[in-house]
Amino acid sequence: MSELTSLTIAEARRKLRAKEITALELTEAYISAIDAANGHLNAYIKVTPDLARLMAKNSDERIAAGKAGDLEGIPLGIKDLFATVGVHTQACSHILDGFEPRYESTVTQNLWDDGAVMLGKLNMDEFAMGSSNETSHYGAVINPWRAAGSNQQLVPGGSSGGSAAAVAAHLCAGATATDTGGSIRQPAAFTGTVGIKPTYGRCSRWGTVAFASSLDQAGPIARDVRDAAILLKSMASVDAKDTTSVDLPVPDYEAALGQSLKGMKIGIPSEYRVDGMPEEIETLWRQGIAWLKDAGAEIVDISLPHTKYALPAYYIVAPAEASSNLARYDGVRYGLRVDGKDIVDMYEKTRAAGFGKEVKRRIMIGTYVLSAGYYDAYYIRAQKVRTLIKRDFELAFNAGVDAILTPATPSSAFGVADENLASDPVKMYLNDIFTVTVNMAGLPGIAVPAGLDQKGLPLGLQLIGKPFDEETLFKTAHVIEQAAGRFTPARWW
């Protein structure tokens, strides 16, 4: 069965269309893999084998009839942030206990319309708030990677840790994810997978549980750049139900792979050389520059002067929006309800019991920065900084830069329950230092595996592009992937 689960989406699609394998055989292989591994990795919080088999049988019928969709018969994992009709959708929070939506998110509906098969719902940080997948009500996800000679459990990154771990461990062919401040790209870098955060508005947010509405964007995590391109083409669409989705044609991203980089300008921002950055991250960055130069791209130094303000501004804007979005969870119509002496007491007890520690922290930060006397000092200033960050990128792109190359993360994956990080949330927030600028500016960004550190753990590079120019990111990331090779964890589970 492992030979089936080792197929990329592109390879599986080819074999399915040639009738060398069936969608049901492929799905059964993944169900068996999940049964064997999930007790060790905790990547899935809900597996849907009966539904998966039914969808696979329907795919086989369409393939036989010559009516195969772009993703016909491809088994996928779905982050628990996406509404799936009649299937557990809780954003990995206790406060949404038992919630099964009567509607389907636009992103997942697009995937099913193209013939994809749902294997189940993937673990994540509660309400997508976290960088390690340790804030989930269902417990931490364990990274399938381990340092050489060590049995220490490592985090897969967050908030899309379940998505990244499942893809890396071959527990799905690909996965949906979301990115508010780095939640696709950081887990991808930590697990040796490819993750792209598209331009804000490229994918509909309808039916996706909101964290910070002006920052949230759905995207795929996949085993390689080609698979990520295939998935994004299906996920992306304009949607009348989401006024922030943009009415632009969705290109054939896969067609961009293999195109020449000759004549392209790649910007290298000096501000991303942060204090205390490990030498191996700097070395990897230099290696990425050399690969792109060898492929014919011109390397130019650029300045993004407001980068240093991005993280503090993000941790004002995102919690402010979260405090508003999460006000709707009160125990009245769905989810957890803790009885109280009156309705206000019920609200308080339900929210106290239902939200985890990190979610409560961010709600309180958001409420504080929006309160009278602090709104101008914090929230308005953070939005002004956001405008300046966006302008920095616009100036770089207007000067002729086609894409920007940076590290994806300041380190490789760290240990589960790291006391140093647990005692100081700001240290955990620093994991987003290279990724939040992209969300603040609404730009596309892709993380691609580029090497291993001294401990044998994956490291990634990030490419940032112009608005709605994901094609350039795919073709450039493909060059890095071809040079670096692909990385798969040694199986220990």
Swiss-Prot record:
Substrates-to-products reaction catalysed: L-glutamyl-tRNA(Gln) + L-glutamine + ATP + H2O = L-glutaminyl-tRNA(Gln) + L-glutamate + ADP + phosphate + H(+)
Alphabetized UniProt keyword annotations: ATP-binding, Ligase, Nucleotide-binding, Protein biosynthesis
SUPFAM superfamilies with a match to the protein in the record: Amidase signature (AS) enzymes
Active site: K79, S159, S183
InterPro entries given in the database record: Amidase (IPR000120), Amidase_CS (IPR020556), Amidase_dom (IPR023631), AS_sf (IPR036928), GatA (IPR004412)
Highest taxon listed in the record's lineage: Bacteria
Molecular functions per Gene Ontology: ATP binding; glutaminyl-tRNA synthase (glutamine-hydrolyzing) activity
PROSITE patterns to which the protein is assigned, alphabetical: AMIDASES
Gene Ontology biological process terms, A to Z: translation
Subunit architecture: Heterotrimer of A, B and C subunits.
Function of the molecule: Allows the formation of correctly charged Gln-tRNA(Gln) through the transamidation of misacylated Glu-tRNA(Gln) in organisms which lack glutaminyl-tRNA synthetase. The reaction takes place in the presence of glutamine and ATP through an activated gamma-phospho-Glu-tRNA(Gln).
Designated name of the protein: Glutamyl-tRNA(Gln) amidotransferase subunit A
Biological source species: Rhizobium leguminosarum bv. trifolii (strain WSM2304)
Gene responsible for this protein: gatA
